[in-house]
């Protein structure tokens, strides 16, 4: 499964995109109409926050989470600051999509909800 892109759809119609391959643009063309709820995508160090924001928008995903935290930790890069900038860019563009940088080795529950304020 190395270097492969695919989408998993749960029984509840929740779509998870796993984008690890190099043909990202072609992959986007195939899954854009599916509008994944969650995009898991490796974040290459040379990607500017604008590039990652573009990828989220190209995919049409609601939430994006990075893969491969080890590269950032090895270089002491602050991925929280990086993804804060990605979210600022998405917000400026009027996108409702957001990137989330999970804490390594911590479990999360991911859901899409509407809650009253």
Please give the residue ranges for each predicted region.
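Core dinuclear metal-dependent hydrolase active-site scaffold
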Residues: 1-33, 104-117
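Loop/turn elements at helix/coil->beta-strand transitions in domains of secreted/extracellular proteins
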Residues: 12-14, 35-38, 60-62, 95-96
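Structural recognition of the beta-strand scaffold that forms the well-ordered cores
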Residues: 16-19, 37-42, 64-67
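Active-site environment of divalent metal-dependent phosphoester hydrolases
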Residues: 23-27, 45-50, 67-80
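A signal for specific C-terminal beta-sheet/loop modules enriched in small/flexible residues
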Residues: 28-44, 76, 80, 84-85
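A short acidic, amphipathic alpha-helical/loop segment
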Residues: 28-31, 50-58
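Binuclear metal-ion centers of metallo-dependent hydrolases, dominated by the metallo-beta-lactamase
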Residues: 57-117
């Amino acid at each position: 499964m190395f270097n492969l892109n695919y989408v998993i759809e749960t029984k509840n119609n929740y779509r998870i995109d796993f984008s690890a391959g190099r043909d990202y643009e072609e992959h986007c063309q195939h899954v854009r109409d599916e509008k994944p709820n969650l995009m898991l995508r490796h974040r290459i160090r040379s990607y500017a926050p604008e590039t990652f924001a573009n990828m989220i928008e190209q995919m049409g995903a609601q939430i994006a989470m990075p893969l491969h935290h080890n590269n950032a930790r090895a270089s002491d890069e602050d991925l929280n600051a990086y993804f804060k900038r990605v979210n600022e860019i998405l917000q400026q563009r009027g996108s409702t999509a957001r990137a989330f940088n999970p804490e390594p080795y911590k479990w999360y529950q991911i859901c899409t909800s509407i809650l009253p304020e």
